[in-house]
């Protein structure tokens, strides 16, 4: 559910071979290194168990059954298999959501527009009265998977096998698409001018200008306006994705070039960068005046807003214009051409399969118990070798307290903040923890230390990580779905482009991006009878503007106070507008309004992440936020200071530099487990595999490592 940024989406349609299996996609992203951690390829680090644990029996908790938590479980399973006889790992997974796949029970799938969940990976099964034979699936979270997401495909390979088939996701621009912005209407597929209805479209021109200004050229002349180490970002992306780049080049990117770029541009918004690029292009004459009527300033603003709605062809970034250029550059450097769908009916199956594989690879030495409990507080408690403590409430609000050797907190930042902030930031002789403000029973702990312990003596150091987590920006996001007959696209009033009906719409109607996605539910090899109509996929302010129409949210089945039909009709109404197409003498009612109205009444559905318990869609850095995000990303390096005896680790896309993507959640899970291995081995990084060591020693430590412990951390 993250931000799709594909500068090459429209331009390189035929350059790269389309992957048809999980294994082919896995090879596409196996080498990629991110600029914040350029010294390590995460898929390579995860190719084998991350390291070894000392012999013994471990009791470990994972809080959260989403992608980060289950990936951490899988890695713990591989570690368990390496333990000697008589040793093992007992994992307790805390997951409060009754609809989680971890609590799968008869009846859940029978709920009309709700399905099983794996954290924010969730789907809604749509059926016409018979849940055993669904009509289509609404992929609420995690609906598409970039080819360069090497760790995602690594785990997909574990879950499904390399031979499992995959399909290209029908992104705007990959399928015939219509773009509507003010008086501007474009139909296109790809970015070759001959594949645009208007080869001289200002939309296509501003796309090329902004892509060049932000990305530049992979070879030849440097043209980007925001270079990294005086070269185009496209050239840096090529190094990061090379199979065998020079080690010194990667080190320079991570330790010099990328930090310099951050220092220079972390205070610059994406919107300001786009305006500067457009202004320079206009002054050079690359972009002409608009209609010869608007003056210079208004022409520049027109182009800035035009790109703001169009983006790189998959939907605009205007709602994200306040994010930092640094955050956008991370996504630009994550350079790819295609996104795919998985070989599943619903994407929750990916996480469920990985959960089952974790227990298989554990070779009988991994024991897993799932607890349907809500974790309210965490702390260290006890005298010497203080153990990690979790206080939780079950579905009847009975209080429970458990001690663990280690805890991985695998929940988004808005959920984590109250869990880790209640016990304060320094040692206390005794504390009463729990949700006393809700009138619930509490529990008394003695000799209490903060859960995210970074110092024995500095409350400010301990507060720093908690406040950093609390200040991360959570982007607002929402989706509105409906079900249509696939044959509806064959009606004569649905326009065609290049011999196919329009299947994606990007517009300023308030709906933002709209997709028609064929159902994964098919019979006897026939074409799917139904398709999911993602009527609206919005971010930030676009999402906020729709919220008053959502009725009973975040999930909107029919109720007495607000019906799904009433909610959906407001979406249809937004598309009722007059549009004038090229060559037409008059504006006519927009055909898309008619397609939206074709949807089945019973299956209209909205999911708004901001009003969901996750409190938002995905982490995204605003200007200045890099310093919070990066501290969270490096948090696991506290394990190098074994004498600190911190037993907590964090794992979520929120604590990565790829907020909203499974790849970010998986990366943070690897970080957490690598840190756990080092901590279990008293700071000895040689316990990690050679490939996994940069996960810890390749990053700047979040704590000062005492001189006596420094040798083992080298």
From Swiss-Prot:
<keyword id="KW-0285">Flavoprotein</keyword>
<feature type="binding site">
    <location>
        <position position="68"/>
    </location>
    <ligand>
        <name>FAD</name>
    </ligand>
</feature>
<feature type="binding site">
    <location>
        <position position="2"/>
    </location>
    <ligand>
        <name>FAD</name>
    </ligand>
</feature>
<feature type="binding site">
    <location>
        <begin position="660"/>
        <end position="662"/>
    </location>
    <ligand>
        <name>FAD</name>
    </ligand>
</feature>
<keyword id="KW-0865">Zymogen</keyword>
<feature type="binding site">
    <location>
        <position position="144"/>
    </location>
    <ligand>
        <name>substrate</name>
    </ligand>
</feature>
<comment type="subunit">
    <text>Heterotetramer composed of 2 alpha and 2 beta subunits.</text>
</comment>
<feature type="propeptide" description="Linker peptide">
    <location>
        <begin position="108"/>
        <end position="109"/>
    </location>
</feature>
<feature type="binding site">
    <location>
        <position position="375"/>
    </location>
    <ligand>
        <name>FAD</name>
    </ligand>
</feature>
<protein>
    <recommendedName>
        <fullName>Phenylalanine 2-monooxygenase precursor</fullName>
        <ecNumber>1.13.12.9</ecNumber>
    </recommendedName>
</protein>
<comment type="function">
    <text>Catalyzes both oxygenative decarboxylation and oxidative deamination, depending on the substrate used. Has high activity for L-Phe and L-Tyr, but relatively low activities for L-Met and L-Trp. L-Phe is mainly oxygenated and L-Met is mainly oxidized.</text>
</comment>
<keyword id="KW-0274">FAD</keyword>
<feature type="binding site">
    <location>
        <position position="660"/>
    </location>
    <ligand>
        <name>substrate</name>
    </ligand>
</feature>
<feature type="binding site">
    <location>
        <position position="120"/>
    </location>
    <ligand>
        <name>FAD</name>
    </ligand>
</feature>
<dbReference type="GO" id="GO:0000166">
    <property type="term" value="F:nucleotide binding"/>
</dbReference>
<dbReference type="GO" id="GO:0050172">
    <property type="term" value="F:phenylalanine 2-monooxygenase activity"/>
</dbReference>
<feature type="binding site">
    <location>
        <begin position="141"/>
        <end position="144"/>
    </location>
    <ligand>
        <name>FAD</name>
    </ligand>
</feature>
<keyword id="KW-0547">Nucleotide-binding</keyword>
<keyword id="KW-0560">Oxidoreductase</keyword>
<dbReference type="InterPro" id="IPR036188">
    <property type="entry name" value="FAD/NAD-bd_sf"/>
</dbReference>
<feature type="binding site">
    <location>
        <begin position="95"/>
        <end position="96"/>
    </location>
    <ligand>
        <name>FAD</name>
    </ligand>
</feature>
<feature type="binding site">
    <location>
        <position position="537"/>
    </location>
    <ligand>
        <name>substrate</name>
    </ligand>
</feature>
<feature type="binding site">
    <location>
        <begin position="652"/>
        <end position="653"/>
    </location>
    <ligand>
        <name>FAD</name>
    </ligand>
</feature>
<feature type="propeptide" description="Removed in mature form; occupies the channel of the substrate amino acid from the outside of the protein to the interior flavin ring in the precursor">
    <location>
        <begin position="1"/>
        <end position="15"/>
    </location>
</feature>
<comment type="similarity">
    <text>Belongs to the phenylalanine 2-monooxygenase family.</text>
</comment>
<keyword id="KW-0503">Monooxygenase</keyword>
